[in-house]
Amino acid sequence: MAKTALTPPASGSEVPRSGTPGDASGNKPQTDATGVSATDTASQKRGRGRPPKAKSDSSQIGAVSAKASTKPSGRPKRNVAQAVPSTSVAAAVKKRGRAKRSTVTAAVVTTATGEGSRKRGRPKKDDVAAATVPAETVVAPAKRRGRKPTVEVAAQPVRRTRKSTSVAPVAANVGDLKKRTALLQKKVKEAAAKLKQAVTAIDEVQKLADGM
């Protein structure tokens, strides 16, 4: 076999760089153990900052499943029917907030009639008496404890009764009535005297008319 002649390096040839690995003579570059050339390492230069984490297959699968399970954002379409909860679940879940007035009034009626639960707090004495005694045997309300009201005390006077003051107004009314009757009689007498004078004048005129 013919040997290939090695061409000696020219005088103007480029001197091998210090960064490029080579053998002891510096003529032949050494092969990289990792199989990556120098150009590849130069292109994969490390940038600034912390390198991003490598995403594993399990995390990607979990993210995909989470996206699939979550509710789609935005307004739902019109033709898609919304999921209606079953009656058993809706009845089991208690609504939050204050109950409606209709339910409150119904509860009050049941407690007032005695069919529902017992009232809260200490019951009144009248209610206790009404509950113990049947409705047919109730004759009068239960007697209350304590001092009687002022109205009942005033109805039973303790001191000597005062003289009746109704006699004085009656006497004043009688005197006023007498004065009015006397004035009326006086006016009637005056009117009768005037009428008498008018009658006598008319008689005189008639006599004069007959004499002519």
Swiss-Prot record:
Residues 176-210 form a coiled coil. Residues 27-44, 57-72 have a biased composition (Polar residues). Residues 103-113 have a biased composition (Low complexity). It is found in: Nucleus. Keywords: Coiled coil, DNA-binding, Nucleus, Repeat. It comes from the Eukaryota. SMART domains: AT_hook. Residues 1-130 are annotated as: Disordered. Residues 45-56, 70-79, 94-98, 118-127 bind DNA. InterPro entries: AT_hook_DNA-bd_motif (IPR017956). This is Putative DNA-binding protein At1g48610.
